A protein has these predicted regions:
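Catalytic cores and motor modules of nucleic-acid processing enzymes
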Residues: 1-240, 245-254, 262, 266-272, ...
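Conserved protein-kinase N-lobe ATP-binding Lys motif
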Residues: 259
Length: 317
């Protein structure tokens, strides 16, 4: 079974003077020169409110929060308010960095992250610093989202810049195993690649049944792709399609099925990355055709499919 199908992924070629070697491309390569220090600190903290917590740093990666009583809250606020502006800023920066932990934004350097926290805090008014102190965990989440967004935008631009320069190439780098042993099993359905496939959700089962029960779809097999160790589209984001399908005509389909609540910005990124993978894989001219599809029960995003459109396309493959 291991020789049934190989799937293509992006690689970079390294030349050490003796021979040229293809190395699997890693998204972190895109962020090595990410200039976080030149990025804006325009962040909307307007939605933050709620209970004040005290935090206990158990280790580098784990923080425990406990709600404060009114008296404790007031005592801490008084201590913070009576500090100088510079001391307040240092305190907030240190708390934010402790919440992040070391190498939280790898490969972005920790010093650059700390400096970004400082610039963000320095932009705050007295009232904003006090509010940040009261809701430090929520502020961290908002700042983290901002950094992730900045890094994501940079990674996408850098990825396509390298694609234009042919610095990234497509090559068969993933093969299916001869057998799998899922810890949780899916409902037994026909035409699965393996005797038993890994667990799938009720929504995924419903979408898969629609495909299998459609008389016009000629499927050779389907496989539930493992979300951690399976086939990954290694683009400006790394993501694992829910299913890999092979049609009788030899078309390989990377299929993602999305519930209606999962149609945010992340899905848009996946569609762009998936369509680029499709284009690059087909350019190999290896005798197969490749398709990337994201399907909703009802179409919600540009570039995605509803059930009817998904089935209509699969019938033609």
């Amino acid at each position: 079974m291991g020789g049934i199908l190989q799937k293509s992924r992006f690689v970079i070629h390294l030349d050490n003077g003796l021979f040229n070697e293809a190395v699997l491309f890693d998204r972190t390569n895109l962020l090595i020169d990410f200039p976080l220090g030149r990025c804006d600190t325009v962040i909307d903290f307007g939605q933050i409110n709620g209970v004040v917590y005290t935090s206990e740093f158990k280790n580098e990666r784990e923080v425990e929060f406990s709600p404060l009583k009114n008296q404790e809250k007031q005592e801490l606020l008084n201590l913070f308010t009576n500090q100088s502006d510079e001391t307040q800023q240092k305190s907030l920066v240190e708390s934010l960095f402790q919440l992040a932990g070391k190498r939280a934004f790898y490969p972005i350097d920790d010093n650059d992250v700390r400096k970004y926290f400082r610039r963000t805090v320095e932009d705050m008014t007295d009232a904003q610093r006090k509010h940040c102190f009261e809701h430090i965990d929520q502020y961290y989440k908002v700042i983290k989202k901002k950094i992730d967004c900045l890094a994501g935008n940079y990674a996408e631009k850098e990825f396509f810049r390298q694609r234009e320069k042919d610095a990234l190439m497509m090559q068969a780098m993933y093969s299916f195993k001869t057998s799998i042993a899922p810890t949780e099993l899916a409902t037994s359905l026909g035409k699965s690649l393996y005797e038993r496939e890994g667990k799938i959700s009720d929504f995924e089962t419903m979408m898969l049944r629609k495909i299998l029960e459609d008389n016009g779809v000629n499927l050779r097999w389907w496989h539930r792709n493992d979300s951690k160790k399976g086939f990954c589209i290694n683009s400006f984001i790394n993501h694992f399609p829910d299913f890999v399908l092979l049609t009788e005509q030899g078309t390989v389909v990377a299929l993602e099925t999305k519930g209606e609540q999962l149609d945010g910005a992340g899905s848009k990124d996946r569609i762009r990355a998936g369509k680029d993978w499709e284009k690059a894989a087909n350019a190999l001219n290896d005798g197969r055709k490749y398709r990337y599809m994201m399907a909703f029960n009802q179409e919600r995003l540009e570039g995605a499919y509803d059930v009817a459109a998904m089935l209509d396309l699969l019938r033609s493959l």
